Design a protein with these regions (language model features):
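N-terminal export leaders
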Residues: 1-15, 109, 135
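C-terminal segment of N-terminal export signals and the immediately downstream linker at the start
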Residues: 6-40
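A generic secondary-structure signal for well-formed alpha-helical elements
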Residues: 8, 17-18, 45, 49, ...
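Proteins with a high burden of low-complexity, intrinsically disordered sequence enriched in S/T/G/P/A and R
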Residues: 17-18, 22, 49, 56, ...
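Short, charged, low-complexity loops and linkers
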Residues: 20-28, 46, 64, 68-72
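Short extracytoplasmic
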Residues: 28-58
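Mature-region segments of soluble proteins
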Residues: 37-40, 57-164
Length: 164
């Protein structure tokens, strides 16, 4: 446990001391590590909801774009917390120890990502459960905010407000 704490502190120091300052424009974007993490968890969280076949990649990319847009609309303090979460998950030693995902995110198996999400969802630690909920809500909000998903749930779309 002390080793995990040391890794977390080391990663925090690395990101606070050596990370380049973020601008307003870059605050709206997810970095490549965060995009890779979300791209790995989207198919697991949305299993059974995402289309299969050739439409699957496009649906995942649209969901990733929706997540990016949703995160950009969050208050700066929440975006900073998400940045810290994604930095923790992107850093190989903490990804392995805290998430149990041994491969880089783009190469992670569906099973290892599902196990990671399940462990965090059911963790006795409130912080891990909160992190799971944040990722889960971002992905679900991005997917169900996408018109591609509406037909599958019987939602006809927003009503027309046209007068006349």
């Amino acid at each position: 446990m002390a080793g995990v704490a040391a890794l977390v502190v080391a990663r925090w120091l690395y990101t606070t001391v050596s990370a380049p300052p973020r601008t307003a424009a870059s605050d709206a974007a997810l970095d490549s590590d965060a995009r890779a993490i979300l791209a790995a968890i989207i198919p697991v969280i949305l299993e059974g909801a995402l289309p299969v076949g050739s439409d699957a990649a496009a649906a995942r990319d649209e969901t990733l774009a929706g997540a990016r847009e949703a995160i950009a609309g969050l208050p700066p303090s929440v975006r900073r917390e998400l940045d810290q979460l994604f930095a923790l998950l992107a850093f190989a030693p903490t990804r392995c120890i805290v998430a149990g995902v041994w491969s880089p995110w783009p190469d992670a198996s569906r099973e290892s990502v599902a196990a990671f999400l399940g462990h965090w969802r059911d963790s006795r630690f409130a912080l891990l459960r909160s992190a799971y909920e944040a990722m889960h809500q971002i992905v679900l909000g991005a997917w169900y905010g996408n018109p591609r998903s509406w037909g599958a749930i019987g939602y006809p779309g927003p009503p027309s407000l046209a007068v006349g």
